[in-house]
């Protein structure tokens, strides 16, 4: 038997022994106590879903006023979670502004919920970009957590009853924004 053949045989035997030991150590023994079940996930509430009521919140706007989502029942609402440092967020803002100007007199409201930035930075950005829709400050990211936002921007369209009707993760085009708004405005309350 050659030297290389002997090495391959030893490797094969070692692999079989290790595999057998692993299988033996993980076997189920009748009458042995069961292990504890895995702990429940940390999240205590499910992610907001299309067709379900939107989680309520009250936040400070950059003008100092308080805005409560529940007070906007009867209107079509776009909740847009964003940040000034987020390039995709910045890219969709002009289309959101155009939609706001076009549909606000038809019962459409934008709530631009900024994630964890200070008011001065948000005010400067809104002024620089000439954005006139309400910008809210989610300083502790509580709304972001309630809506289980993992990517910015994230947008939630609500019908007049406060039910989530569409969710978009990432930037939206003008066509998506306006098409969704038109559909929701056309519905009877």
Regions found by a protein language model. Name each.
Residues 90-129, 139-146:
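Structural microenvironment flanking redox-active thiols in thiol-disulfide oxidoreductases
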Residues 57, 67, 72, 81-85, ...:
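Conserved hydrophobic/aromatic "anchor" residues
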Residues 75-77, 81-85, 151, 161:
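Short pre-active-site segment immediately N-terminal to redox-active cysteine/selenocysteine motifs
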Residues 1-53, 180, 189:
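N-terminal targeting signals for export/organelle localization
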Residues 124-132, 137-188:
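Thiol/disulfide oxidoreductase modules built on the thioredoxin-like
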Residues 48-51, 56-77, 103:
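A short beta-strand-turn-helix
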Residues 73, 81-98:
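Conserved redox-active cysteine motifs that mediate thiol-disulfide chemistry
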């Amino acid at each position: 038997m050659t030297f290389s053949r002997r090495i391959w045989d030893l490797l094969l035997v070692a692999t079989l022994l290790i595999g057998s030991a692993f299988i033996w150590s993980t076997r189920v023994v009748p009458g042995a106590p069961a292990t504890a079940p895995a702990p429940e996930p940390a999240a205590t509430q499910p992610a907001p879903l299309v067709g379900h009521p939107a989680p309520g919140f009250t936040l400070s706007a950059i003008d100092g006023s308080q805005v409560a989502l529940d007070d906007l029942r009867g209107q079509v609402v776009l909740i847009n979670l964003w940040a000034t440092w987020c390039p995709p967020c910045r890219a969709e803002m002009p289309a959101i502004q155009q939609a706001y100007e076009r549909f606000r007199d038809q019962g459409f409201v934008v709530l631009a919920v900024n994630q964890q930035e200070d008011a001065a930075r948000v005010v400067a950005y809104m002024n620089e970009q000439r954005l006139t829709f309400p910008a809210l400050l989610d300083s502790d990211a509580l709304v972001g957590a309630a809506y289980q936002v993992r990517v910015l921007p994230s947008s939630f369209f609500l019908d007049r009853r406060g039910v989530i009707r569409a969710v978009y993760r990432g930037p939206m085009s003008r066509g998506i924004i306006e098409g969704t708004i038109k559909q929701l405005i056309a519905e009877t309350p």
